[in-house]
């Protein structure tokens, strides 16, 4: 059977850089950092005291106050991003065939704040017997965001959550892409969400020595591909891409941001947290996405890398790019928007996919900030264009987004300019 073409017709985002796609994209191009001291809890006894929090968000602008209390923060962010995306795509919900519209969101951890609150409450009152909130489980579980999005809009199509740590929302986008091109849906609200800036979240990642502890200079802590990088910066947020079958989009006169043309998955099969030192899984997943898209390395103008600012991960990803792209690696732009957003965990792929879509649409590459000229790692080839510190204008025919998760999960998607 001939596969259907899939385009992006709507965007939504709630990030540490802004509470919608426009604010987020503008801040990216300006090279702003979302990092600041943590405000959600007392960090006195924590080694990492800063993160990239979502700021100045009035949840009740989107969700009824009573309903919002029944949702973990990650679900609130997911729902807000989806509301933005559905509005942006301009679909007439009164006329839409809601049986052909689905929801696939990626979530890496889920309701960790809810878990903390309920278990903490139980620990204080366990002598009186269990007294759990009836919303404890529905608030906590990782699949519930997709459910709430479908309930909000009455979408009866495919509905589920993908969980593959930091690759979760890229897997969601890739899965939604396949469902549409196989004819199983006309439109899918896809993306991801995460809200793990909690005592357990920050404490757990700190115990793994995964987080930066540059507490005296949070804004400059996330510095991918610099020698002085010392770990990632926790972030939170959500991103939404409305994926739609091309003819369906054209029939309703939808605006088209870009075309999604390929996706790939692979496994490192190496270590539960560390990436393969030679970038094996990263190489495989990028090749899989290129093959799926029918593209060659020289067709890619921009790679939004996983680039978390960790000592091992950044090096292995660069190795994979050089191995696979060869001479073409030195002609394209590379950047890590995590230098600005922090690491959004399960939401990272969705927000970074949005950055790729907007790069393709606008012919501009957001920067990798916080690099200093003399801060070079001898294992990294600086002949590559990492788009350090300043956005760069160039033609972007196609953009590739990498995400890699604990467990060795790798996912990749490719967007290109839409043409008839």
List PLM regions with ranges.
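Conserved beta-ketoacyl condensing-enzyme motif
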Residues: 8, 24, 32-164, 193-202, ...
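Glycine-/small-residue-rich "gating" segment that lines the acyl/pantetheine channel
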Residues: 124-133, 174, 178, 194-251, ...
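Flexible, low-complexity linker/loop segments at domain and module junctions
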Residues: 1-8, 95-98, 293-299, 330, ...
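Conserved small-residue
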Residues: 10, 28, 82, 103, ...
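ACP-dependent fatty acid/polyketide chain-elongation machinery
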Residues: 1-67, 89, 247-257, 354-368, ...
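Acyl-CoA/ACP chain-elongation machinery
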Residues: 39, 184-230, 263-277, 307-314, ...
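Condensing-enzyme catalytic core mediating Claisen C-C bond formation in acyl metabolism
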Residues: 5-9, 36, 216-293, 302, ...
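Active-site-proximal alpha-helical scaffold in enzymes
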Residues: 78-91, 145-146, 150-153, 158-194, ...
């Amino acid at each position: 059977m001939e596969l259907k073409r899939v385009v992006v017709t709507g965007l939504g985002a709630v990030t540490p850089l802004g509470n919608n796609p426009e604010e987020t994209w503008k801040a990216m191009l300006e090279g702003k950092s979302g990092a600041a001291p943590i405000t959600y809890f007392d960090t006195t006894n924590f080694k990492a005291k800063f993160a990239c929090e979502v700021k100045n968000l009035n949840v009740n602008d989107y969700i009824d106050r009573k309903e919002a209390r029944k949702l973990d923060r990650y679900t609130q962010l997911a729902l807000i991003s989806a509301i933005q995306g559905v509005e942006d795509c301009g679909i007439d919900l009164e006329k839409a065939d809601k049986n052909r519209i689905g929801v696939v969101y990626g979530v890496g951890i889920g309701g960790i704040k809810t878990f903390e609150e309920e278990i903490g409450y139980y620990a204080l009152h366990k002598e009186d017997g269990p007294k759990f909130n009836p919303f404890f489980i529905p608030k906590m579980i990782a699949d519930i965001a997709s459910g709430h999005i479908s309930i909000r809009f009455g979408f009866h199509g495919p509905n589920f959550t993908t969980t593959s740590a930091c690759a979760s929302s890229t897997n969601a986008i890739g899965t939604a892409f396949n469902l549409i091109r196989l004819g199983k849906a006309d439109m899918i609200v896809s993306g991801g969400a995460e809200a793990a800036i909690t005592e357990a979240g920050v404490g757990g990642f700190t115990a793994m020595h995964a987080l930066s502890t540059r507490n005296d200079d949070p804004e400059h802590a996330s510095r991918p591909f610099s020698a002085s990088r010392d770990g990632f910066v926790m972030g939170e947020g959500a991103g939404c891409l409305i994926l739609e079958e091309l003819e369906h989009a054209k029939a309703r006169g939808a605006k088209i941001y870009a075309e999604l043309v390929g996706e790939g998955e692979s496994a490192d099969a190496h270590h539960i947290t560390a990436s393969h030192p030679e970038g094996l899984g990263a190489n495989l997943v990028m090749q899989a996405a290129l093959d799926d898209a029918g593209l060659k390395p020289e067709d890619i103008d921009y790679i939004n890398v996983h680039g978390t600012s960790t000592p091992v991960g950044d090096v292995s990803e660069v190795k994979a790019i050089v191995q696979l792209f060869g001479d073409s690696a030195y002609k394209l732009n590379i950047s890590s928007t995590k230098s600005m957003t922090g690491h959004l965990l399960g939401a990272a792929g969705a927000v970074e996919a949005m950055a790729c879509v907007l790069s393709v649409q606008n012919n501009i590459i957001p920067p990798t900030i916080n690099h200093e000229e003399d801060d070079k790692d001898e294992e990294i080839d600086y002949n590559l264009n990492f788009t350090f510190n300043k956005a760069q204008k160039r033609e972007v025919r196609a953009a590739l987004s990498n995400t890699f998760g604990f467990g060795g999960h790798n996912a990749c998607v490719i967007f290109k300019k839409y043409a008839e």
